[in-house]
Amino acid sequence: WMAQVATERLNQMQDPELSINQALVDYKRLGYSDNWINQRLKSIEIRKDLTDEWKRHGLQEGVQFATLTDIIYQTWSDMTAKEYKQFKGLKKENLRDNMTNKELVLNMLAELSTKEISESKNPETFREHMDVAEAGGEIARNARMELEAKTGKAVISPLNAKTGIALNSSPEEEDTKE
C-alpha cells in the first residue's frame, strides 16, 4: 500500500496533471458539484498567482502570508480567517473548501485584485503590502455589498461541506440553502 502511494506521488511529481485529476476525483468523491469544483480549482490558481507575487517581493510564507490573507478576508467579508472558520463551524478544515460559489468568487476577486494592485504599485514595505491587501479586499467588499443590496440576500453563509454546500446541487439549489 505504501509503495503504491509513493509510486502515485512520484508519478504526480513527474506529471502534475495527475495531481489535478486526483483532486477532481477527491472532490467528486466528497460530493461536490462540478460547478463548485471548477470554481475551487480556479481559486487555487488565483491564490498561487497571488502568493507568487508575494514571494517575488520577498515576503515569507507563514506569518506574513497569513497576515495579508487575514486583511483580505477581513476587508471583503468583515471576518478574519479564524472568525470565518468559526462562523462556518470549522476546526481544521480548509476554509476555501467550505465556501459557497459566491464566497469563492468574491474571494477570488479579492485575491486577483490584490495581485493586480501589487503588480501595479510594486509595494516595498510590509506596511505597503498590507495596504495593497486591503485595497484588493475592498474591491470584493464593494461587489459583495452591491450584490447583497440588489438581491436582499447575505452572501456570507454559514453553510459548509458538512451542511450541504455545493454537494451535488445546482447553483439555484445552493441559493435556496442560504
Model-predicted segments: where are they?
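Positively charged, phosphate-engaging catalytic surfaces used for nucleic-acid and nucleotide handling
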Residues: 1-178
